[in-house]
């Protein structure tokens, strides 16, 4: 008789229930290996469309495809066991209609086995969020600075810093919550606005350049590890892995060129005749 241990993975309702409780910890991951490390300490792993910047070197997230998100989402699911895995819906996969959004989100859930999707937009996407949640697809919202809107925003700048600019962002937060999202990312907004949104909506807010008062925080893994050449103001670098990785690669290259590697301990001898 075999004994099987069931490992419970966090769900969207688990995260929703954290409103006003212990802060929610979230990081991005795009690979099975990094997912296995992040999974030990985080409640949520976001397979962000930021993979376009981090993995592929795109200037924006606009070129990212649904197929890219599904491939990396599946990898992160294989590498993790405990955290809720949320996969971003890329630009062009959900905006045209509620039906398009459903088909894209259903593909993501079916092909990656993740627990939720994330999409950008507030009031304008509320109907779509409701359509998805009513059909069994958990949705994480995303308001404030929305990177997929770079071509209309003109630049990646913080939102809500001017007098009288709060109301549209507050309306977005209310719309996302009322539509049934289980949580919402609030990106790059004035700190008092991030705090106010957190205090006034019923779902958890996950800040990225918003406020310490948010119900949770998220960063891009490579940014906080010191692997990105440029980091936004809201990023704290918890490591400086870039120089260490470069030193390791340099050491390897030097030893290969000098024939110091591989050494005797790294090669195979003949088996003794028996």
UniProtKB/Swiss-Prot annotation:
InterPro entries: Pantoate_hydroxy_MeTrfase, Pyrv/PenolPyrv_kinase-like_dom, Pyrv_kinase-like_dom_sf. Keywords: Cytoplasm, Magnesium, Metal-binding, Pantothenate biosynthesis, Transferase. The keyword Kinase does not apply. Its main location: cytoplasm. Its cofactor is Mg(2+). Pfam families: Pantoate_transf. It is an enzyme of class 2 (transferase). Binds 1 Mg(2+) ion per subunit. The active site is at 187 (proton acceptor). One of its GO terms (biological process) is pantothenate biosynthetic process. It is found in: Cytoplasm. One of its GO terms (cellular component) is cytoplasm. It comes from the Bacteria. Pathway: Cofactor biosynthesis; (R)-pantothenate biosynthesis; (R)-pantoate from 3-methyl-2-oxobutanoate: step 1/2. It catalyses: 3-methyl-2-oxobutanoate + (6R)-5,10-methylene-5,6,7,8-tetrahydrofolate + H2O = 2-dehydropantoate + (6S)-5,6,7,8-tetrahydrofolate. Mg(2+) binds at residues 49, 88, 120. Its EC number is 2.1.2.11. Belongs to the PanB family. Homodecamer; pentamer of dimers. This is 3-methyl-2-oxobutanoate hydroxymethyltransferase. It comes from Rhodopseudomonas palustris (strain HaA2).
